[in-house]
């Protein structure tokens, strides 16, 4: 799978509910169920060009929502920061011997795991 494909499905996870029913249906068939444009065309009894146009409108809408709202970018930033914090906690766990500090570190680690989105 290429990065564009994965990014588009991530956008769909965040903003898919904002698409029209027809856009959602075609997007899911194409991206999530791996149907070709021709297969979707046959199943929905619309032209291949109609499927293509609807899919492109859905993709453009998802990109527009991300441009305006930035939820995916923010989510990725949060996940990257959580990963850095987890790595820091592991380093502290390996080096720290004070039981009280280790207890605090374990509590912080549990809180971070609960945040894992």
Swiss-Prot record:
The lineage of its organism: Bacteria, Bacillati, Bacillota, Clostridia, Thermoanaerobacterales. Might take part in the signal recognition particle (SRP) pathway. This is inferred from the conservation of its genetic proximity to ftsY/ffh. May be a regulatory protein. Belongs to the UPF0122 family. This is UPF0122 protein Teth514_1714. It comes from the Bacteria. SUPFAM superfamilies: Sigma3 and sigma4 domains of RNA polymerase sigma factors. Pfam families: UPF0122.
């Amino acid at each position: 799978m290429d990065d564009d494909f994965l990014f588009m499905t991530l956008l769909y996870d965040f903003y898919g509910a904002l698409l029209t029913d027809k856009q959602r249906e075609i997007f899911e068939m194409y991206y999530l169920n791996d149907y070709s444009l021709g297969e979707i065309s046959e199943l929905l009894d619309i032209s291949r060009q109609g499927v293509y146009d609807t899919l492109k409108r859905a993709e453009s809408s998802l990109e527009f929502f991300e441009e305006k709202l930035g939820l995916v970018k923010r989510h990725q930033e949060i996940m990257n920061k959580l990963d850095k914090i987890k790595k820091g906690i592991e380093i502290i766990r390996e080096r720290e011997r004070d039981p009280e500090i280790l207890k605090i570190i374990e509590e912080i680690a549990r809180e971070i795991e609960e945040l894992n989105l």
